[in-house]
Amino acid sequence: LLMVLGFFFATYNLVSMIVGHKVGSDLGSIVDGKVEFTNTKSKFHVAVTATDAAYSQWQCRIMYYWYKKAKDMPGSAMGKFTRILHSGKEDQLMNEIPTFVVDPLPDGLDRGYIVLNRPWAFVQWLEKAVIDEEYILMAEPDHIFVNPLPNLASENEPAGYPFFYIKPAENEKIMRKFYPKEKGPVTDVDPIGNSPVIIHKYLLEEIAPTWVNVSLRMKDDPETDKVFGWVLEMYAYAVASALHGIKHTLRKDFMLQPPWDLEVGKTFIIHYTYGCDYNLKGKLTYGKIGEWRFDKRSYLMSPPPKNISLPPPGVPESVVRLVKMVNEATANIP
């Protein structure tokens, strides 16, 4: 195990040096230690990290279906699409979805927390892939593009979504293990994860190796691991960004999350991470399996059936729209 760890960190340090060289030579002018950019209208590359598990595959297929529908709509700044497959080998979707295969972390290093592979996957992809666009959207398999997505970022300030449960200030004791006082107040750390985020490619090249390092350090610290749990990697991205002095524009309209967000409106992405449980009167029964339900975790081993029944009257429009979009995708995917 020590040899594996040594090899991994040697590889990580080499990538850091290469990425650091690219950042230093290609970013442009630096004023008072901060990078200054001018272009704000470029397209962004849509990148989603994934595994070869059936659960990940069916979500990616639905996401890619709606990407293709939204890409060329008026107001969209979407460029090309890549599924970054961190299972280390090809799968059966290679010819259906543009895919770039990267290596997972060495055996045992993720300690069962598979999301820890995400920052390492981005480091490898950024170094090895040819990416034409100047910006990148970091997305997830359970994202559906519900409105044309413009480039919400500027070249020196990425755009992110503020998560109500990412609370750096309330976890200052833990945050100081990774964001020391000399770096500034913990309020420098944005209440975000890495997804959804639209970011200039060179800024992500700067952040990504630090994101790997902070993620591994957090997972290795028992207190941090216990307190942050499944959102540990999200905190790691937020801290890594702050360590590089990078602030995100916080866009609540970036994403909605049924069943808590009731209307689609002018938001851009539906994130169906939460289960939607209702009784037949249209009342939410969250925490209790409903008489009607849609929960992605019901389909761990195989995709959802075609033509899922629509929710009963009274259920919010966001949930109805989600089910209709899933149904349209599954009806048109072979």
From Swiss-Prot:
What does it catalyze? trans-4-hydroxy-L-prolyl-[protein] + UDP-beta-L-arabinofuranose = O-(beta-L-arabinofuranosyl)-trans-4-hydroxy-L-prolyl-[protein] + UDP + H(+)
Q: Where mainly found?
A: Golgi
Give the record's GO CC terms. Golgi membrane
Annotated membrane-spanning segments are 1-18
Localization, per the record, is:
Golgi apparatus membrane
Q: Which InterPro entries match?
A: HPAT-like, HPAT/SRGT1-like
Q: How is this protein positioned relative to the membrane? A: Single-pass type II membrane protein
The annotated consequence of gene deletion is:
Dramatic increase in root nodule number when inoculated with Rhizobium strains. Inhibition of root growth in both the presence and absence of rhizobia.
**Which cysteines are cross-linked by disulfides?**
none
Highest rank taxon of the organism? Eukaryota
The protein's UniProt keywords, in alphabetical order, are: Glycosyltransferase, Golgi apparatus, Membrane, Signal-anchor, Transferase, Transmembrane, Transmembrane helix
Which Gene Ontology terms cover its molecular function?
A: hydroxyproline O-arabinosyltransferase activity
Is Transferase a UniProt keyword of this protein? yes
E.C. number: 2.4.2.58
Q: Per its UniProt entry, what is the enzyme's top EC class, as one word?
A: transferase
Task: Describe the family membership recorded for this protein in Swiss-Prot or TrEMBL.
Answer: Belongs to the RDN family.
PANTHER family per the UniProt record, alphabetical: HYDROXYPROLINE O-ARABINOSYLTRANSFERASE RDN1, PEPTIDYL SERINE ALPHA-GALACTOSYLTRANSFERASE
Its annotated function is as follows: Probable glycosyltransferase involved in the O-arabinosylation of several proteins including extensins and small signaling peptides. Catalyzes the transfer of the initial L-arabinose to the hydroxyl group of Hyp residues. Probably involved in the arabinosylation of CLAVATA3/ESR-related (CLE) signaling peptides that move from root to shoot, to interact with receptor kinase signaling that regulates nodulation. Involved in long distance nodulation signaling events.
Name assigned to this protein = Hydroxyproline O-arabinosyltransferase NOD3
Organism per entry: Pisum sativum
Gene name? NOD3
